[in-house]
């Protein structure tokens, strides 16, 4: 039913494109596909996106959405949290920027894995960003929670989101931050090479 409704094989879509002339790999979760829940196929798609970014040396921009792991699919869905986390770590080892752009709602195992691992976190205004539900947390801590608890505004205030950006402005902000990150990375790499060359020179002379 979900495939017929969305014309997709799974909830995750992966694409390539460019922002400000910068080639990127992008991914998004379609909430209309079983509530954006992540099963085995979705995890594979996210990992494929990471591999595409590494193979093509592009930043990875992802738009998470959904209620978490698709547990009726078996523990394989839960294992997707670990697998996607390990994949994002590989992206970071390759020094490629990873930007997570939270959409409404982002919850459960999605929040607790790849969605919260971005170098930069953008969020649309008023998004629900959570792991467990508000009532569950309230019952656990036995305290009153603020009205904006688990919203993108609350997350920004507490350091989990870098900036709240309206969808119409996302392209501009993503382009700006990627330009800064890639320029800085280029300068750092260049500096490291120069430093390495200076360090190697005395050893070269000693060996000659």
Give the label of every model feature segment.
Residues 15-18, 120:
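Short beta-strand elements
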Residues 17-28, 45-70:
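A structural preference for short, pocket-lining loop segments at secondary-structure junctions
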Residues 31, 38-47, 55, 66, ...:
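Conserved mixed alpha/beta catalytic, RNA-binding, or beta-rich assembly cores of soluble enzyme
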Residues 67-185:
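Conserved catalytic cores of soluble enzyme domains
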Residues 176-195, 200-205:
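C-terminal intrinsically disordered, low-complexity extensions immediately downstream
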């Amino acid at each position: 039913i979900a495939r017929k409704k969305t014309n997709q094989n799974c909830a995750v879509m992966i694409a390539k494109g460019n922002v400000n002339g910068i080639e990127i790999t992008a991914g998004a979760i379609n909430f209309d596909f079983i509530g954006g829940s992540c099963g085995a196929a979705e995890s594979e798609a996210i990992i494929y996106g990471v591999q595409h970014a590494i193979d093509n040396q592009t930043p990875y921009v992802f738009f998470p959405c959904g209620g978490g792991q698709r547990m009726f699919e078996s523990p394989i869905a839960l294992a997707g949290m670990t697998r996607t986390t390990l994949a994002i770590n590989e992206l970071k080892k390759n020094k490629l920027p990873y930007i997570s752009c939270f959409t409404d709602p982002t919850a459960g195992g999605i929040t607790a894995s790849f969605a919260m691992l971005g170098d930069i976190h953008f969020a649309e205004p008023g998004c629900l960003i959570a792991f467990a539900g508000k009532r569950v947390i309230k019952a656990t801590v036995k305290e009153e929670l603020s009205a904006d608890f688990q919203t993108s505004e609350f997350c920004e205030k507490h350091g989990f989101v870098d900036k709240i950006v309206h969808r119409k402005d996302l392209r501009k902000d993503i382009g700006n931050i990627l330009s800064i990150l890639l320029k800085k990375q280029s300068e750092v790499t260049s500096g490291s090479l120069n430093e390495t060359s200076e360090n190697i020179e005395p050893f070269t002379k000693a060996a000659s």
